[in-house]
């Protein structure tokens, strides 16, 4: 979510939670430079994930080498932009940011209600593509440096693996 990063260690055989931790211990910072704007620093997500993971491992006394799989759940519709070196170019525009709604409304009008509601199941006003259109128009110097865009969970996966990819459900977020 946008308020903290949570790590849980689950026994795959029993399905029981062995340990769980979250960081930061107070609500995560949301940067709101203007009304309707909401951004977070993706690097803070990564740092908080490392802290939460360390706490879970310490509490459970499980050796990290014994962990067989990692699952990632995350806030939707956040836009993370990275350069060719996988460095974050700007704070992520997160799900509750509404600055790009006019871009989404234009897409809704261009694509048509039928397409949007039957394929997207929603108006694209708050979707990732609308946020990217906002950056293109309002921050062209950032836009020119973008190598890849991703969702918050994809950023964490990139930090864990070094690979930039997404999921089928991530692709559906528009």
Question: Language-model segments: which ranges?
Answer:
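N-terminal glycine/serine-rich phosphate-binding loop of ATP-dependent small-molecule kinases
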Residues: 1-90, 102, 106, 118, ...
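Gly/Ser/Thr-rich active-site cleft segment
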Residues: 2, 115-174
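Structural signal for hydrophobic packing residues in well-ordered secondary-structure cores
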Residues: 13, 53, 57-61, 108-112, ...
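Carbohydrate-associated surface elements
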Residues: 97
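Flexible glycine-/small-residue-enriched beta->alpha junction loops
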Residues: 104-110, 154
């Amino acid at each position: 979510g946008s308020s903290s990063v949570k790590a849980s260690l689950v026994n795959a055989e029993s399905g029981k939670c062995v340990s769980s931790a979250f960081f930061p211990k107070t609500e995560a910072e949301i940067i709101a430079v203007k009304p309707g704007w909401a951004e977070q620093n993706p690097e803070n997500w990564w740092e908080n994930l490392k802290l939460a993971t360390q706490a879970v491992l310490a509490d459970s006394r499980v050796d990290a080498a014994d962990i067989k799989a990692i699952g990632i759940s995350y806030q939707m519709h956040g836009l993370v932009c990275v350069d060719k070196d996988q460095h974050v170019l700007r704070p992520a525009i997160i799900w509750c940011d509404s600055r790009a709604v006019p871009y989404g409304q234009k897409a809704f009008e261009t694509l048509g209600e039928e397409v949007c509601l039957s394929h997207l199941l929603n108006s694209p006003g708050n979707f990732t593509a609308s946020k990217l259109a906002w950056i293109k128009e309002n921050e062209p110097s950032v836009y020119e440096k973008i190598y890849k865009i991703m969702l918050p969970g994809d950023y964490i996966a990139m930090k864990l693996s070094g690979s930039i990819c997404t999921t089928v459900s991530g692709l559906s977020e528009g």
